[in-house]
């Protein structure tokens, strides 16, 4: 299976926000990434609009229909924005005030489960595929399936942040088992969070893995190599086989 690459361009908008400017434009970044073979563009519209703005979502969805993967919290506000601009897919993620980045998967307890299931149904009714960002554990995969979501994105944060080879291997095993279970349940399996050029190959080699969503590492490298070269290098990494 050829693993697809989704490129998260949030930090192009972070650079724009650093000076309160109107550039660099995420739309230009999307053009470069798609031109270098990225399967789709990932953007996280946060409640505080710290980087990506509503207008970015509008422009991206109009310019690249079928290529925009929107990450957002499971709220009515975000549901309504998704229904308005109709990205190809939406990944529901946990979001907490003040966090620098998403720290883990969704809590699929009873209250959250009902809300997420409802939003999933509403988005799918308008032809938008739904993904859930979850921790790599069997129970989480099964609960995600029960919501009706078509995709799971397994959080690779613990794998990426592992301090020892032993811990990294253990986290990789969890990702492997969860990805296999997801595929057996008929779910499309993605992964992301903290992946970079040094640690991506083992995850890309997992049997059931279909897509990797990577942003910060690519944008950081692009400062030195240019965005096109950074995307190309990551494309080569996700296709590398043992």
Curated annotation (Swiss-Prot):
GO molecular function, one term: pyridoxine 5'-phosphate synthase activity
Active site: 44 (proton acceptor), 71 (proton acceptor), 193 (proton donor)
Location in or out of the cell: Cytoplasm
Gene3D superfamilies per record: Aldolase class I
UniProt-listed InterPro entries: Aldolase_TIM, PyrdxlP_synth_PdxJ, Pyridoxine-5'_phos_synth
Entry binding sites for 1-deoxy-D-xylulose 5-phosphate: 10-11, 46, 51, 101
GO biological process: pyridoxine biosynthetic process
Any one cellular-component term (Gene Ontology): cytosol
Pathway: Cofactor biosynthesis; pyridoxine 5'-phosphate biosynthesis; pyridoxine 5'-phosphate from D-erythrose 4-phosphate: step 5/5
Alphabetically ordered keywords of this record: Cytoplasm, Pyridoxine biosynthesis, Transferase
EC code: 2.6.99.2
Catalyses which reaction(s): 3-amino-2-oxopropyl phosphate + 1-deoxy-D-xylulose 5-phosphate = pyridoxine 5'-phosphate + phosphate + 2 H2O + H(+)
Site feature Transition state stabilizer, where: 153
CDD domains registered for this protein in UniProt: PNPsynthase
Transferase found in the keyword field: yes
SUPFAM superfamilies: Pyridoxine 5'-phosphate synthase (SSF63892)
Family membership: Belongs to the PNP synthase family.
Self-association and partners: Homooctamer; tetramer of dimers.
Role summary: Catalyzes the complicated ring closure reaction between the two acyclic compounds 1-deoxy-D-xylulose-5-phosphate (DXP) and 3-amino-2-oxopropyl phosphate (1-amino-acetone-3-phosphate or AAP) to form pyridoxine 5'-phosphate (PNP) and inorganic phosphate.
Protein name: Pyridoxine 5'-phosphate synthase
């Amino acid at each position: 299976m050829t693993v697809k690459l989704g490129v998260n361009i949030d930090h192009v908008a972070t650079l724009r926000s650093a000076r309160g400017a109107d550039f660099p434009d995420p739309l230009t970044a999307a053009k470069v990434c798609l031109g270098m073979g990225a399967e789709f563009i990932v953007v996280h519209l946060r409640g505080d609009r710290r980087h990506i703005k509503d207008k970015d979502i509008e422009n991206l969805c109009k310019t690249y229909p079928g290529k925009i993967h929107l990450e957002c919290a499971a709220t009515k506000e975000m549901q309504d924005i998704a229904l308005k601009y109709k990205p190809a897919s939406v990944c529901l993620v946990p979001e907490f005030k003040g966090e620098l980045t998403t720290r883990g998967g969704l809590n699929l307890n009873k209250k959250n489960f009902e809300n997420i299931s409802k939003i999933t149904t509403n988005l799918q009714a308008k032809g938008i595929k739904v993904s859930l960002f979850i921790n790599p554990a069997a129970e989480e995969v099964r609960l995600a399936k029960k919501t009706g979501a078509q995709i799971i994105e397994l959080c690779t944060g613990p794998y990426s942040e592992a301090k020892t080879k032993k811990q990294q291997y253990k986290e990789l095993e969890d990702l492997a088992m969860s990805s296999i279970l997801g595929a057996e349940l008929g779910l499309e399996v993605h992964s992301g969070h903290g992946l970079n050029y040094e640690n991506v190959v083992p995850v890309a080699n997992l049997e059931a893995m279909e897509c990797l969503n990577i942003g910060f590492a690519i944008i950081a490298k692009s400062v030195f190599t240019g965005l096109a070269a950074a995307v190309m290098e990551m494309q080569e990494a996700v296709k590398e086989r043992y």
